[in-house]
Structure formats: structure tokens, C-alpha cells
């Protein structure tokens, strides 16, 4: 019997997409589901950015774009990095891709050889280990749990490094936890990295603008780290442009050339119209970014307050992104008389089927004691969702 390739059979399906699909199926049946499983802003793309895209269509930006992205967009990204992050990159050190997910995948595929190790702190974004496996690498998971605010320590990093370690993947602000590494914490990690030759860090900074003011720092800022860091970012979260599919890497030119070679065979250049919209996003008025940041901060404060009022949940206050990652293990082994909760996946399914609130179990993110809720939704939805959760959890004995 014909089968799919071995490399594909090693991959797990996306748990976040599976839960979102289950939620959509229930909604199609007329069930009032509040979907807090989705990792995207609920805002519309700002009108000036949409107008820039319409202008690009009228100006006939309808042909293949250069594989690394339009020069004007790469220049706009370089200026953004200088202006906001105090990092100097040339356009030749920037590669634009079809979303930050492709940027991550390009980097892993370009740098990781068969059998080489990639250190990934857990909790992690669900796709990181799968991308490493796809590249033939070995994910090395470092547990950074609730008690340490979901952040890997330099001692843990040092202990995980072997002669076969090629890369570390670091996401700050974090999906799924909302944790943010401070400048001092990043510097301590950088000092460990710099002690080891040919060791790189993929710094996923896609949530950089969704933080408490002044919280975001880049690991590339420290002496010697620009040569070791691959920054991944994009327009999806900051500008509510998830569907436009524009991400990028900023990295040493030799790495960018390698990723460009790979991208040239996979997809070629990103969508021409999306690139012009992204260019305007970076050079235009940034007030929309601050407006959305303030909305997420208000929602964060609301959901934290309500979650802390639910007996049995333990809550760390997220400093960035738009996720709450509470500890739910106190409910394991409990039952409402029909359903028994054995793990975080059971817990999330119970909330969906009985409370009609979609979330994602922490098993998918490498932390079996917690679950993820996105608060990228209205205040009204947050209040109602937390009411439902509190009500159905009270039935577990």
C-alpha cells in the first residue's frame, strides 16, 4: 500500500489548528462557542495599510517579486530595526518570507544538519519541534515550568548544550505563556551561547509590540550576538495582518543567502501586494500599534483578574503576547460524573464540550500541567468565557 514519506509520518498535526477546527464545527451546528484557541488579533488591518495595498494593485504590483522581497520593504525593515531596536542591519541581511512561520522553517532547514540538536525551552510554540524534526534534527526540550515563570535559566541552557548542539530557539514575548525575558536574563543566556563556537539562537520576536511598555529586548543587542542571532519577526501580530503572510529574518548575510536559496526553490518571493502593505505599515504612523497594545493590556488585566477568581486555577501574569497559560493540574483525576479529566487535553476538551469555550491543552506546548487561552477577543467574550469556565469547573469533584 502506498504511504506518505517517512519524514511526514514523523510530524504531528497542529493541536491549535485542530481545536480551532473543532470549535468551528460546533459553531456550524449552531452552538455558541467562544473561541479562545486562536493565536491572532481580532482587530482588522488598519485602513491606511489597506489603502496602500489597493494602491499597489492599481500600480500593477502583480508580477513575481524578488525572492528575498522588494528592496524598499527590506530597507523599511532595516530602518525599523535601527529605530526601535537600535540594531544595524543592511537590506542584504534581511529576507522577507510568506509569514514568520516560513522564516522560522527557512532558518532551521538552512542551519540544522541531520542529527544535530536544537534546544527548545518548554512551554514552546507547537511548530518548533516539528520543524526541527522535518529538518532531520533532534529537539532537545528544556523544561521551564510555572514555578520559574516559564523562562529557561542560563544554568539550564549550559547543562543542555552538547558538542552536537547547533541552535537554540527562544520566543520572547512567548507563545504560549506570555512570559518576557528581561535584558539581564537575555544577557545571561547570551554569555552562555558565546562560550560555544558555531552555536546560534533563533530569536522569535513576532510579539515584540504586544508587551508592557519597555519590556521587549532583543538578544541580538549584546556584543558578539549579532553574528549568532537570527531575528524572526513580521507584521502579523503588531499590525493585525495575519492573513497577509509577511515575515522576515534579520541575520548574518551568509545565513540570509542560504535561506534565500532555499526559499527560491520552495515558494519564491512573497505576495507583491502584501509586501507593499507591509512596507507602509513600517514607515507609516505607528499609533495603531500602540492602540492595539493598550487594548491587549486591558484585556490581559481583565482575564487575569477573572482567572484568579476561579478556584483550582493557578495564574502567572503574562507580560506580553495575548495568551494566558494557567496551571490546571489540580483538576486532574476529577470528574463531573460523566467525564474524567486525566490531562490538560482532556481539560481543554471538557471546557469546549461542556462550557463551549475553546482553549488548547498544555500537552501540545510541552507543559502537561497548563492550558492556553487567547485573550485576543472582546472584553464581553472574555467575561462570558470566564463565567462559563468557572461554572463548569465547579462541577468537577
What are these regions (language model features)?
Residues 61:
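Flexible nucleotide-interacting loop at or near the entrance of a catalytic core
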Residues 2-4, 12-14, 19-22, 26-33, ...:
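PLP-dependent class I/II
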Residues 64-97:
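Conserved N-terminal alpha-helix of the aminotransferase class I/II PLP-enzyme fold
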Amino acid at each position: 500500500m502506498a504511504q506518505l514519506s517517512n519524514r511526514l509520518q514523523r510530524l504531528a498535526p497542529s493541536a491549535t489548528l485542530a481545536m480551532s477546527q473543532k470549535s468551528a464545527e460546533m459553531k456550524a451546528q449552531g452552538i455558541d462557542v467562544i473561541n479562545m484557541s486562536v493565536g491572532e488579533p481580532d482587530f482588522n488591518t488598519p485602513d491606511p495599510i489597506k489603502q496602500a495595498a489597493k494602491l499597489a494593485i492599481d500600480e500593477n504590483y502583480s508580477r513575481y517579486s524578488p525572492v528575498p522581497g522588494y528592496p524598499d520593504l527590506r530597507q523599511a525593515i532595516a530602518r525599523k530595526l535601527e529605530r526601535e531596536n537600535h540594531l544595524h542591519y543592511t537590506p542584504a541581511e534581511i529576507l522577507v518570507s510568506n509569514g514568520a512561520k516560513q522564516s522560522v522553517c527557512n532558518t532551521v532547514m538552512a542551519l540544522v544538519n541531520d542529527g544535530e540538536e536544537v534546544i527548545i525551552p518548554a512551554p514552546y510554540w507547537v511548530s518548533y519541534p516539528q520543524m526541527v524534526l522535518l529538518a532531520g534534527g533532534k529537539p532537545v526540550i528544556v523544561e521551564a515550568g510555572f514555578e520559574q515563570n516559564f523562562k529557561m535559566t542560563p544554568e539550564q541552557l549550559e547543562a543542555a548544550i552538547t558538542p552536537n548542539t547547533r541552535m537554540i530557539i527562544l520566543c520572547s514575548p512567548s507563545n504560549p505563556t506570555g512570559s518576557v525575558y528581561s535584558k539581564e536574563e537575555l544577557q545571561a543566556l547570551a554569555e552562555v551561547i558565546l562560550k560555544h563556537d558555531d552555536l546560534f539562537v533563533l530569536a522569535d520576536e513576532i510579539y515584540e509590540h504586544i508587551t508592557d511598555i519597555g519590556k521587549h529586548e532583543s538578544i541580538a543587542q549584546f556584543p558578539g550576538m549579532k553574528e549568532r542571532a537570527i531575528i524572526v519577526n513580521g507584521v502579523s501580530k503588531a499590525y493585525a495582518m495575519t492573513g497577509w503572510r509577511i515575515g522576515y529574518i534579520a541575520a548574518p548575510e551568509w545565513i540570509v543567502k542560504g535561506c534565500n536559496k532555499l526559499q527560491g526553490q520552495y515558494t519564491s518571493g512573497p505576495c507583491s501586494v502584501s509586501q507593499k502593505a507591509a512596507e507602509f505599515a513600517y514607515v507609516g504612523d505607528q499609533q495603531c500599534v500602540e492602540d492595539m497594545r493598550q487594548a491587549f493590556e486591558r484585556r490581559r488585566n481583565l482575564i487575569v483578574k477573572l482567572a484568579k477568581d476561579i478556584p483550582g486555577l493557578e495564574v502567572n501574569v503574562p507580560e506580553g503576547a495575548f495568551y494566558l497559560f494557567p496551571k490546571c493540574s489540580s483538576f486532574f483525576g476529577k470528574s463531573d460524573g460523566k467525564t474524567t479529566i486525566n490531562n490538560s487535553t482532556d481539560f481543554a476538551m471538557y471546557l469546549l464540550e461542556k462550557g463551549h469555550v475553546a482553549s488548547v491543552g498544555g500537552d501540545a506546548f510541552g507543559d502537561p500541567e497548563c492550558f492556553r487561552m487567547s485573550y485576543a477577543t472582546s472584553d464581553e467574550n472574555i467575561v462570558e468565557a470566564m463565567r462559563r469556565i468557572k461554572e463548569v469547573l465547579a462541577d468537577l469533584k
